[in-house]
Regions:
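Membrane-helix interface segments
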Residues: 23, 38, 53-58, 122-129
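Interfacial segments of alpha-helical transmembrane regions
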Residues: 44-72
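Transmembrane helix-loop junctions in multipass membrane proteins, especially transporters and channels
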Residues: 53, 81-86, 146, 150
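Alpha-helical transmembrane segments of multi-pass membrane proteins
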Residues: 65-74, 134-137, 141
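Membrane-embedded catalytic cores of phosphoryl/pyrophosphoryl-handling enzymes
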Residues: 92-150
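N-terminal transmembrane-helix/juxtamembrane module of multi-pass inner/ER membrane proteins
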Residues: 1-39, 73-101
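Hydrophobic, aromatic-rich transmembrane alpha-helices
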Residues: 41-52, 114-117, 128
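Residue-level signature of the transmembrane alpha-helical core
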Residues: 30, 46, 62, 131-135
């Protein structure tokens, strides 16, 4: 293995061996599920369109999500074609339904940080919780052994 992959697997195994617990096994999958298909982020953008005070933020969020979809899921994932860590390391039990697309970059994490970035620019009262959620989403993808830290 190359040094980057060795580092990635060491981090993922550290999480699995030292942080994993039944409490996180219960809450991490539902948090990660919120990012499936980007629906929670799309819903947030659409809801914002209904209110004059948040309409511009909703449009900006929607535009960011569309750009992220194009760059992340349609361009980078097939270009980089990085297999999932659970496919690389033997004997890894995954506690969610295994994704079948490539690992890099994480669509869940990309969308969460797109939303958080727009919201931080527009109103920190919403941006800070969105940023915390984005970091939580990134952690869930590592915890579930479906993405690499790099």
């Amino acid at each position: 293995m190359n040094p980057i992959v060795e580092f990635d697997i060491a981090v993922l195994n550290f999480i699995r061996e030292h942080i994993s617990c039944s409490f996180l096994d219960a809450i991490v999958p539902p948090i990660s599920f919120l990012g499936n298909g980007g629906w929670i982020f799309i819903l947030a953008a659409v809801i914002m369109l209904f209110f004059r005070s948040t309409r511009k933020t909703g449009l900006m969020t929607g535009a960011a999500l569309i750009c992220g979809l194009i760059v992340c899921n349609l361009a980078l994932k097939p270009l980089v074609a990085r297999i999932r860590p659970f496919d690389l390391v033997e004997g890894i039990d995954v506690i969610i339904k295994k994704p079948h697309d490539y690992s890099f970059p994480s669509g869940h994490t990309t969308a969460a940080f797109e939303l958080a970035t727009v919201w931080m620019m527009r109103d920190r009262r919403f941006g800070i919780p969105a940023l915390v959620f984005a970091f939580a989403m990134a952690f869930t993808r590592l915890y579930l052994y479906v993405h690499y830290p790099t």
